[in-house]
């Protein structure tokens, strides 16, 4: 049986490969058909934000299967469940920052409305799935996990409002967006 460190490294490489596939394959497929990579990246970002909580839970379940037999449901199992909460929270913030980057960068490419549509939809579904997934997967214990996530979901929402205000004031300053 491979060592625990080796199994965790393999797991993180697998997560990275999944994220790259989710972003790059649809983006380049849409570029091939639409000849517009920014549209493809926006679409892929929304897919990533929708699937990120699901991927986090799936990969944490695999991590639990790796660690929990050694921990025998002791202190380390609680640590693993807190990793799950941090993974969800960090995933939400990173996916939002990526969406904000796409919004700001796409202004010069003239596809801001499509980017706002896809990233906004993906971001809202991401928040919804983060609020609902712990309860659906873990029942009453999941409700406690969701409560732990609340400050990070609020921080993510504040980031969304900040970027929205920035875009609004940039538009008012004479910078226009077009399709």
Put a short name on every predicted segment.
Residues 6-13, 38, 67-89:
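Transmembrane alpha-helix entry/boundary detector in multi-pass membrane proteins
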Residues 22-31, 55-60, 90-105:
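Canonical alpha-helical transmembrane segments
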Residues 26-34, 100-112, 162-179:
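Cytosolic juxtamembrane helix at the C-terminal end of the final transmembrane segment
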């Amino acid at each position: 049986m491979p060592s625990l460190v080796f199994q965790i490294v393999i797991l993180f490489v697998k997560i990275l490969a999944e994220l790259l596939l989710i972003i790059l394959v649809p983006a380049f497929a849409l570029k091939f058909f639409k000849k517009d990579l920014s549209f493809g990246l926006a679409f892929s970002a929304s897919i990533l934000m929708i699937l990120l909580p699901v991927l986090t839970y799936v990969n944490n379940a695999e991590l639990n299967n790796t660690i929990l037999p050694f921990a025998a449901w002791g202190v380390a199992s609680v640590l693993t469940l807190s990793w799950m909460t941090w993974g969800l929270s960090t995933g939400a913030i990173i996916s939002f920052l990526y969406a904000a980057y796409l919004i700001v960068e796409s202004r010069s490419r003239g596809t801001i409305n499509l980017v706002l549509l896809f990233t906004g939809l993906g971001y809202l579904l991401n928040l919804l799935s983060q609020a609902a997934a712990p309860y659906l997967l873990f029942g009453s214990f999941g409700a406690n996990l969701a409560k732990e996530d609340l400050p990070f979901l609020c921080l993510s929402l504040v980031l969304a409002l900040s970027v929205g205000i920035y875009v609004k004031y940039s538009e008012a300053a004479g910078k226009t967006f077009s399709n």
